[in-house]
Amino acid sequence: MKKMQSIVLALSLVLVAPMAAQAAEITLVPSVKLQIGDRDNRGYYWDGGHWRDHGWWKQHYEWRGNRWHLHGPPPPPRHHKKAPHDHHGGHGPGKHHR
């Protein structure tokens, strides 16, 4: 009897495996579902509150350390500051331009 149960179990797993491999959602127990790569027909990804396109994810998150991280705040703008040693070769205003 145990051998028959093992055969039935193995056969049912073989028959169900192709359906599970194609499913975007697998029900583990009646109230728990596992969602894998949830995308809509436009190719947008679900983030738990909104459908986001691929570009949005690249702008807001980065993959490092085996998980997704928010990008940090943008760097402050760079301001052009003249260096005190910048003499333009001695040809600036006041030098030979009168």
UniProtKB/Swiss-Prot annotation:
Listed Basic residues bias regions: 77-98
UniProt entry keywords in alphabetical sequence: Signal
Region named Disordered: 68-98
Annotated signal peptide: 1-23
Superkingdom of the source species: Bacteria
One Pfam entry name: DUF2502
Family affiliation: To E.coli YpeC.
Protein name: Uncharacterized protein YaaX
Source organism phylogeny: Bacteria, Pseudomonadati, Pseudomonadota, Gammaproteobacteria, Enterobacterales
